């Protein structure tokens, strides 16, 4: 075979996926990369060898990709006690929420996230790991996503005059979770119209004191 033909191709996407190698390589193959930083490939052109049908050259057409939307951090709500924590905002959504509840409210909370290359990220455990009661709220991700959180906080026995979270309730684009903790009227709502929740931050000690959210615009791509 004429050495001046393309013997293999591999494709990469913006989501970090790499295709299998199509064709085969040889020990003396010359590698090339078609890429333009910040652009997507929207078409191809090239040359082929008449008679054999082999492709001898390949080029690409590029178009600038829109910048990904920036996340926004909404202020945490709750009491002033506890140490600050922040799971970050480098996620595409929330898959599961683990809520530890006790007789006086929310003892702990932990979140399971997914990022833009479909990796599952387990967030840190915030609050008392020695749970008295453990509940889970599963989302049907990616079709289901969080849109708001309702909660209430108050001073309870053992909180040393620091207000702690006593109730949380989560709403998605499809449904509303049960009320976790005490059955109390909400004193705050974490929500931004047209956005989904992709991360959490707050303050905790042996209880959850404060909770805030990171949000991204809802897209339907």
Curated annotation (Swiss-Prot):
Domain of life of the native organism: Eukaryota
Protein name listed in UniProt: Jacalin-related lectin 47
Gene3D superfamilies: Jacalin-like lectin domain (2.100.10.30)
Gene behind this protein: JAL47
Alphabetized Pfam families for the sequence: Jacalin (PF01419)
Residues in Jacalin-type lectin domain copies: 1-64, 71-217
Coiled-coil positions: none
Stored SUPFAM superfamilies: Mannose-binding lectins (SSF51101)
Keywords: Lectin, Repeat
Stored InterPro entries: Jacalin-like_lectin_dom, Jacalin-like_lectin_dom_plant, Jacalin-like_lectin_dom_sf
Homology family: Belongs to the jacalin lectin family.
The keyword Repeat is assigned to this record: yes
Gene Ontology MF term list: carbohydrate binding
Organism encoding this protein: Arabidopsis thaliana (Mouse-ear cress)
Tagged with keyword Repeat: yes
């Amino acid at each position: 075979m004429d050495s001046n033909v393309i013997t293999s191709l591999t494709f990469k996407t913006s989501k970090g996926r790499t295709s299998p190698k199509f064709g085969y390589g040889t020990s003396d193959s010359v590698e090339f990369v078609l890429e333009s930083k910040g652009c997507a490939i929207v078409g191809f052109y090239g040359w082929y060898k008449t008679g054999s049908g082999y492709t001898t050259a390949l080029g690409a057409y590029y178009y600038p990709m829109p910048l990904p939307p920036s996340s926004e951090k909404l202020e945490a709500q709750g009491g002033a006690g506890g140490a600050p924590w922040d799971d970050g905002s480098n996620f595409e959504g929330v898959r599961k929420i683990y809520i530890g509840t006790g007789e006086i409210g929310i003892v702990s909370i932990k979140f399971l996230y997914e990022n833009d290359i479909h990796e599952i990220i387990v967030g840190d455990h915030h609050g008392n790991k020695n749970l008295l009661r453990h509940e889970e709220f599963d989302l049907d991700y990616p079709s289901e996503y969080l849109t708001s959180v309702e909660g209430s906080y108050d001073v309870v026995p053992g909180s040393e005059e620091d207000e702690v979270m006593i109730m949380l309730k989560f709403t998605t684009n499809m449904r509303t979770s049960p009320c976790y903790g005490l059955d109390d009227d909400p004193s705050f709502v974490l929500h931004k119209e047209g956005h989904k929740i992709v991360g959490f931050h707050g303050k905790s000690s042996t209880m959850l004191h404060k909770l805030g959210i990171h949000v991204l615009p809802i897209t339907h791509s």
